């Protein structure tokens, strides 16, 4: 596994429409790509990554919401200075790595939900985006087997966000022209300050 470079705006490759993974491409190279994508996403850290974000124009995306495991025993973190201050407990993260190859939304819901989205390719910029609250997705796994699944909540939103990447669309493209310009200006200022 290897951590790959994540493309950031204004890299023109992010506007590329990704190609489907062909039947003869379900092989060790694809498995390596997926492994690298997970490692890259976790290192960033993020909850979703499309192959085009690491420069590979294929219809592959990975998601792991990394939600707290509320069924597990809380773990202590921080440093206790003997006075009870500083140490606190948190729930360990429950990893649920998901792989979607050649995903296709076949039944988007008309009811919308709003999430504040961010993107590893548009670092440190967040904005509210409206998307269908639920959707049905058809996709393939690493073996090429086809699955169909109903998604809702953050998973549905994340999937739709990552699927936009496969079409060369960034979450800021859903914003008004003014909000998009403001976001890009803020990103430019942050880069100049760094």
UniProtKB/Swiss-Prot annotation:
UniProt biased composition (Basic and acidic residues): 76-93
Entry's EC annotation: 3.5.1.88
Keywords: Hydrolase, Iron, Metal-binding, Protein biosynthesis
Residues reported to bind Fe cation: 119, 161, 165
Active site location: 162
Reaction catalysed by this enzyme: N-terminal N-formyl-L-methionyl-[peptide] + H2O = N-terminal L-methionyl-[peptide] + formate
Matches recorded under InterPro entries: Peptide_deformylase (IPR023635), Peptide_deformylase_sf (IPR036821)
Function: Removes the formyl group from the N-terminal Met of newly synthesized proteins. Requires at least a dipeptide for an efficient rate of reaction. N-terminal L-methionine is a prerequisite for activity but the enzyme has broad specificity at other positions.
Protein name in UniProt: Peptide deformylase
Organism, scientific name: Erythrobacter litoralis (strain HTCC2594)
Gene name per UniProt: def
């Amino acid at each position: 596994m290897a951590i790959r470079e994540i493309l950031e705006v204004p890299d023109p490759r992010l506007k590329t429409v990704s190609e489907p993974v062909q039947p003869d491409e379900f092989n060790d190279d694809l498995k390596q790509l997926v492994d690298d994508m997970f490692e890259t996403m976790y290192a960033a850290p993020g909850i979703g990554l499309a192959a085009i974000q690491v420069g590979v124009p294929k219809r592959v995306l990975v998601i792991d919401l990394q939600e707290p495991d509320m069924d597990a025993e809380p773990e202590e973190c921080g440093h206790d200075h003997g006075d009870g201050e500083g140490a606190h407990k948190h729930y360990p993260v429950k990893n649920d790595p998901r792989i979607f190859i050649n995903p296709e939304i076949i039944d988007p819901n008309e009811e919308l939900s709003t999430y504040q989205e961010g993107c590893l390719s548009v670092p440190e910029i967040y904005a509210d985006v409206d998307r269908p609250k639920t959707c049905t997705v058809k996709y393939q796994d690493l073996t090429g087997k086809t699955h169909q699944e109903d998604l809702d909540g953050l998973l549905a939103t994340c999937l739709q966000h990552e699927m936009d990447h496969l079409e060369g669309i960034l979450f800021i493209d859903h914003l008004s022209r003014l909000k998009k310009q403001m976001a890009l200006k803020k990103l430019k200022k942050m880069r100049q300050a760094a």
